[in-house]
Regions:
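Conserved catalytic core of Hanks-type protein kinase domains
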Residues: 27, 43, 76
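A short, surface-exposed loop/turn module that caps and links secondary-structure elements
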Residues: 41-66
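Enriched for short, Lys/Arg-rich terminal
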Residues: 1-8, 12, 68-72, 76-109
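Residues that form or immediately flank small-molecule/cofactor binding pockets and catalytic motifs
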Residues: 20, 59, 91
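Arg/Lys-rich, positively charged N-terminal/basic patches that mediate binding to nucleic acids
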Residues: 1-39
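Amphipathic alpha-helical interface surfaces
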Residues: 32, 36, 40, 50, ...
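Short, intrinsically disordered, mixed-charge
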Residues: 30, 41-45, 107
């Protein structure tokens, strides 16, 4: 797992990526990455957004969606250690990003 500290300031949660999610992050286009980065910084202050809560196997996870670009970022909030853990980042095509997130969630200790 890779850690990214929140920018200096009053951020409460730290950001971490699963290794596969970090690879996906690094492969993103610069403009998509910048948009997601800005949204993630806001989520580090308040990660529990009711409208972004997922269901089913991902019921303890949340999403950030970029409608125009078609990307989704799926994360889990670990309140006990104040961490936002990114599980997957990809296009929504065929729900692949959600399937990846479920698989990674099941294999994550």
């Amino acid at each position: 797992m890779t850690n990214f500290e929140a920018p200096e300031g009053s951020k409460k949660y730290r950001l971490k990526f699963l290794p596969a999610a970090l690879e996906e992050w690094h492969s993103l286009d610069g403009s998509v990455k910048l948009t997601l980065k800005n949204l993630l910084q806001k989520r580090l202050e308040n990660p529990h957004i009711p409208g972004a809560k997922l269901q089913g196997d991902l019921r303890n996870c949340y999403k950030i969606k970029l409608l125009k670009q078609g990307y989704r970022l799926v994360y889990q909030v670990e309140d006990d250690v104040l961490v936002v853990l990114v599980l997957a980042v990809a296009k929504r095509e065929d729900m692949a990003v959600y399937h990846s997130a479920v698989g990674r969630l099941l294999s994550h200790p």
